[in-house]
Amino acid sequence: MSSNTVAQFATELKMPANVLLEQLRAAGVDLKSVDDSVTDSDKAKLLDSLRRAHGATDGKKITLTRRQTSEIRQADATGRSRTIQVEVRKKRVFVKRDPAELAAEAAAEAKAAAEQAAAEAVDMQPESVEAQAPAPQSVEALAQAPVEAVKPVEAEAPKIETPPVETPAVEAVEAAAPKIEASEAPAEPVQTQTAQAVEETPAPAETPEPVPAVKAEAEPQSAQPAASREQSTAQPVEPEAKKESVAAPKTQEAGPESVVHAQTDLNSKTPAPVAKSETAPSAPKAAQGRPQVAEAARPPVVNDRAREDARRAAEAEAAALREMLNRPRKVLRAPEPEPAGTNNAALSGTLHKPAGKKDAAAAPAAAPKKEGGNKPAAAGAGGKKVIKTAEVSSTWNDDASRKKPADKAAAPGGNSRDGWRSGGKGGGKNSRNGRNQHQDRRNESAAQEFIAREIHVPETISVADLAHKMSVKAAEVIKQLMKLGQMVTINQVLDQETAMIVVEELGHVAIAAKLDDPEAFLDETPGVSEAEALPRAPVVTVMGHVDHGKTSLLDYIRRAKVAAGEAGGITQHIGAYHVETDRGSVTFLDTPGHEAFTAMRARGAKATDIVILVVAADDGVMPQTREAIHHAKAAGVPLVVAVNKIDKPEANPDRVKQELVAEQVVPEEYGGDVPFVPVSAKTGAGIDDLLENVLLQAEILELTAPVEAAAKGIVIEARLDKGRGPVATILVQSGTLKRGDVVLAGASFGRVRAMLDENGKQVQSAGPSIPVEIQGLTEVPAAGDELISLSDERRAREIALFRQGKFRDVKLARQQAAKLESMFDNMGEGTQTLPLIVKTDVQGSQEALVAALTKLSTDEVRVQVVHAAVGGISESDVNLAIASNAVVIGFNVRADQSAKKLADNNGIDLRYYNIIYDAVDEVKAAMSGMLAPEKREEIIGLVEVREVYTISRIGTVAGCMVLDGLVRRDSQVRLLRNNVVTWTGQLDSLRRFKDDVKEVKSGFDCGLTLRGNNDLQMGDQLEVFEIKEIARTL
């Protein structure tokens, strides 16, 4: 009993092995894997199972496919030979009819024979092809047994060159079959290769599928109604026919379709064979409806003269086709450029057809399509639809004709958009004249004269875009940059200066420009200049050294207790408060005094009208006090000095005045313009005088701002809130900000969803000098960004995206420059890095902490801030820490549960801090631990050589006395002779009497040997020392 494996059986059946295995298991065959063997009985079980499942008792159709592959070499216009792969697939389909159905059809045939006998007898005489049909002479009789007509045709199909039965006209029409089939079934890739083989080889290749269809076209037009009716009847049946073959499911895809076409086109003589032959699986239902179909499908009787005329016309056309195909072939020549008015509709799509025969070939090919009556053929004859070689997606001529208008447009100006990306859609194998066109373009560009252009260079531009602007290849730009000493890639971003140098080196005129800058629209904001300016409250910033009492002073003014709730008792954010006093309203900005918050204080000075400089009476002028004075002077803001803590016994206001005079801050009593007010934040003494001086300064300044206008302001602080998203504290400087307004802040934009005042209460609008907290921005803006209210959200988005791209390009250009500069600096150095990820609660704290930590870097250990952002510590931060081996620092933020678990599993160090001092100190300690320890020598003893012995096995042994300290066996020693160091090394052994000892103390004698040195003399001294490692600190 023969057997093979499931995998081999699947290969024979041309189907996946796992699908076959499932079918065998469903049939009841117990198989474990595709490597198990399959017996004939198992195959029989599978066949029975499939027959039951598909409702068929016998195989109805067998398809045989033979494939042949060959190559054709053809020279093109440039003289290069081109190899073309040609694949010919020959297919035969045999259909077995059901005996019961044949009997029913024979009965129906006999019934209809009497009515149609005379007409059919006349039609059968002129043509020898119809000798293949059965004996009965009626339409219904031919409809009953179309398989007998199909089988002989299929049998003769491989011998198309010399058919024994067909007339010459039919043979010629058969040779043209691939073109007709191309319009009927444009989705079969197999017939593409077949059609190419027909036209590219001297003898026509076998194409059995379209043969019956071609015979039908040689017939008169009288069969059009019946053919169209039967075609619509046969189409729904095709899927059932495809299910019938179990052995070769994939190879049958073209089979049923070819049979449908063959039988449909035979209906020019026999109206209804297709429905009956293709609906064999559903015979009972089909048998009921056949009498009606036969009645409806009867064609009218046509006179013999019309048939004879149509046959002669078809013979003439077929003869012309045969003559054209038998002509000797010529070598393909490049087509001459056609004038603008030439009609390209008649061009053939075949690669190897001679150029001179295109028009001649198109006319005979169009005539049979008109005769056939098909819609696709009619469309092709009308010139509206391009007839392609076969079912291919595009023809070569199609691509060439598509390319011609573009070439004409590009040729006169010479400024083709191809540039370095030349090689458009038509290139490659599918382009008939692609190589010729590229060669012509190269010759054209070489012949063109150089044109100096004015190139507008933006702030940043990539190498590719710069080359495109100058209409040169990107390689030219890269080459020029290499000459200038810069290695770049095609996508690298260049800064404006470098790009302008390259443009000028290449002979063009460089113009620094900002093309299409959307920020130019911001200057056109209407309503600001027209609105009436009204008096506004002053914005007062409180500045000074840390712990000098700034927040406590504000607390007393606001009747609040903020300082008590702050971590470490120090301010680490900018606080904005609006206070209503008896003399009017004042907006206060409280800035941090710690040295790390320099940028925050600078922002506070820019946004303010008046600065209150707080100096402690017991402490005097300190570094941050001087820095605050410089910020105020740089911003051109008037100062009011508040000398705080005057209630303390050690307070000395006069010393403070003297120190401030040294800093160019002269009090009014000394002839200056700066008011000095002694205050106490604890008792409240002098607070009223301070507010009076502040409001007096505000009156002198005459502060005004438009109210009924679009809002403008500044971002004081920004943070990422887990529940509310990006939140920004802003100070409105002019106009009125309302809930629902579209705002733009730096590179972020959005619609104001909610506004809160400093007490957390909802407000609907905010006028000038009012601080509010807004929600609704797309991302966290940078502190210090300008905020503008716009009427159009689309414009706000456009400007924000432009700023983001600009910021990204500038950042990339800076990074590239920094990499190149630091590459050589760090080369050869053993610099260690401490990678950190910093997450803070607000933008300002992040800035300050990153600046303070980066400042700790030394030549040996460098702090590398891998990532710094606002918001809680998330899983993505921990993943980044895992990848970069970094320590995560959370400043006033915490990690969520998933991030904690991930950090614990991967050993990532999470550090939380509330005070900036602690974070800086711990990072400094970690960096100290990374420093290489300092090595120091420590002398622990002195030994004198009293006797020298030479022992053959050991060498020179010194008998010594320990004069000072001690000597250890693993110590290092220096040999001193006449107080001059002659050798440095280690002890080899140390003994006292006959015993090995670890150490010998002062006053005892011992014997010792030196490792690698036997040059010992009496009176030499040995200095014993140890090297100790001492930890270094920053």
Curated annotation (Swiss-Prot):
PROSITE patterns: G_TR_2, IF2. Residues 304-315 have a biased composition (Basic and acidic residues). Residues 535-702 form the tr-type G domain. GO terms for molecular function: GTP binding; GTPase activity; translation initiation factor activity. It holds the Pfam family GTP_EFTU. Residues 590-593 are annotated as: G3. One of its GO terms (cellular component) is cytosol. Its main location: cytoplasm. Residues 569-573 are annotated as: G2. CDD domains: IF2_eIF5B, IF2_mtIF2_II, mtIF2_IVc. Residues 118-140, 154-446 are annotated as: Disordered. It is found in: Cytoplasm. Residues 680-682 are annotated as: G5. Coiled coil: none annotated. Residues 162-178, 212-228 have a biased composition (Low complexity). The keyword Protein biosynthesis applies. GTP binds at residues 544-551, 590-594, 644-647. Residues 544-551 are annotated as: G1. Residues 644-647 are annotated as: G4. Keywords: Cytoplasm, GTP-binding, Initiation factor, Nucleotide-binding, Protein biosynthesis. NCBIfam families: IF-2, small_GTP. One of the essential components for the initiation of protein synthesis. Protects formylmethionyl-tRNA from spontaneous hydrolysis and promotes its binding to the 30S ribosomal subunits. Also involved in the hydrolysis of GTP during the formation of the 70S ribosomal complex. PANTHER family: TR-TYPE G DOMAIN-CONTAINING PROTEIN, TRANSLATION INITIATION FACTOR IF-2-RELATED. Belongs to the TRAFAC class translation factor GTPase superfamily. Classic translation factor GTPase family. IF-2 subfamily. This is Translation initiation factor IF-2.
